[in-house]
Curated annotation (Swiss-Prot):
Location, primary (coarse class): nucleus
InterPro entries (alphabetical): DNA_replication_reg_Sld3_C, Sld3
Annotated GO biological process: DNA replication initiation; meiotic cell cycle; mitotic DNA replication initiation
Entry's localization field: Nucleus
One Pfam short name: Sld3_STD
Keywords: Cell cycle, DNA replication, Meiosis, Nucleus, Phosphoprotein
Region annotation Disordered: where it falls in the sequence: 459-505, 517-568, 590-610
Keyword Nucleus: yes
Name under which the protein is recorded: DNA replication regulator sld3
Amino acid sequence: MNNDHASKKSFCIKAPSNWEKSYLEVWPLVTVPRQCICLRWCISKEYHEFTCSSLQFIVIRPAGTSVLLGRVKSSKANQLVGIEHVEGSRYALIFLSEKLDFKSLKVIANHQLTKSSKSLSNVSNKPLGDQLFRSNSLMSPSLLKKELHRIQSDASQANERESQAPHSFVTHDLISSSKDGNSLTHEFANDSVTEMVQDYTPSCSRDVKSLLDHLYNSYFYQLLMTKTPVVFYVKQMVGKTRQLAVEVHNHVEEKALVDELLKFLDNLKSVDDRKSRLLQCFESHLNYKAWHLEFENEAHQYEIKGYRLWLQNILNRENCQITKLDFEREFSQLKLKEYEIRVLLYFEILYLFLKWDPEYARRRANDNSLLDSRDSGKRKSRKKNAKTLNPFETAQLKLEFTFDGLCIRRTIEQNATERSEDLLLKFCKETIVPYYSSKFPRITRNLLEKCNGLDLLPERSHKHRHSAPPRSKLISSKSEAGRALPGNTSGASISNTSSPHSEASISKDYEILKRRRSNSGVHSLTRSDSSFNGFERDTRRRSSDIARIKNREINLPSSSLSKQRNSMHDISTNFPRRNLSFTEKLTMASLQGQSEESVQPKTTSSLSRSKTLSILEGSVSKRSEPSMDSILVQATPRKSSSVITELPDTPIKMNSLDKASACTVENHIVTESPAHKSNKAQLFVCVPTTPVKKKSASP
């Protein structure tokens, strides 16, 4: 950028490679709405890319809000260009057609050319977009006239420098248009100030038209002009819209107000009705043709403005390679948004009707009770004599149909995208439940039932929270049942030696615990009640242990081992003996008893697997006998009468079974208990005693 261009109030940009000069000199003329260029001007298909220091001048398709018009000098002729600030440091440079008609343009001054012309010389210090394009800086009518006059004088000076002036009609049109300064000022005020005020501030009047304008404005603004969540829309309706409706109701007749609201609901066109025209303009844009978005039917001004802005936002993408698939994707999201906004709007209309006349909802409830009767004849006669729907019923039917469409759309979208989050339930949780569930409980329940969202209701979550008993109460009931278990067993006393893990006792205790739990009022258990689940787990483990004990093999020493042991015993008498461990001594005693049994006939006291299992089964089945409650493996201590006087070198053979006998094996005594004589089904147990050292003979 050169400083000598500042006196000419122009700026330079880098020219394309096929141009003779390396830069383009641009004289700014005026700023016009970008929409006018999109609608009325044909744009060439030849797009060029320019760079100027750190700025990037790119050519995009028609979109945006405002464009700076200027002239470019070339070797052949002058050419009109349009420069648009898009976003950040991105700009669009468009070569426009020479067939311009400034009378058809509405001139607005959303930037000050005095500041922009001064800043053209130092672009490197400050971004060009910060000075050239200020969409929010509005000018007063008097200042607007001065700026228009300055623009005209600058344009006339630029035309005088040209050797040929084939485009002098531009300045003439500017001068002719500036003569009617009042009309320009009036148009500017109507188009910029009043529309912005109507878009963002509610009207202060208290008539029906002001309420309808506010409803139209808020509806299309949320649908087409913003990307904020719909929860902000419902907050606005609960606040501003509801307050304005109440004030209008105080000044207007109720019947007229209700009729106007119903007419408003009928006049809301679906986005499907506008799709064909939107798609036609989109395809014209892809083919580099001029397009003008208008609707055949009568449309509200906010609706037209909203659809134009929505379409421009689609076209004004960073990636210029947009296709029809992108349009379909954006339109599908717009359809979903329309369903959500309409559901909230119908809820708010129902609230207003109910607030103005509660009889609407009462008559609706009575009609439902009659229609739900089982008598088909009465139902048919009721349908024949039914009158037209009241306003409450009309709005409710629209609400139900719209919510059905929302459910279908969300289901299709969730199946196509495979999202984990349910956006339909999220919408109900954030908007319907907190704002309208308490006012319309029956309607809300019917809608949530369609999307499996009944758990979102406060009373249902309250029931789930209190359906399970408190944990302290559950634990106390279990402890009481556990303490009552011993008293509910058989009347006979249980000996201390009885096994606590028998299968019959465990199953019986489990049945008692279940009966105690049912009597104590505990009806349901949650997944957090791990104590009772632990008891069931222990019960199954104990029963499996008993089955494993029954099937366990009892390994007894074979006859070959006993013969080998006897032969080794004869050899060991000739050698000095070493100190044996307790296990070896116990094994020797068992082998000695086994060898004795092999000689004598088989008796009831033999250690066989079949006899042991029969004893085990008999002890479990006969619970009534105290002596048979266990396997009765008893350890009998050594009697005080059994005095060892001398330890012989060789073991003593077992005597006859009719007398009490003692078998001495080295330093241990195997004693048969007197109780075993009366009950031959009992077992032998080896009892260790304190070894006694052998007294050495005196020399």
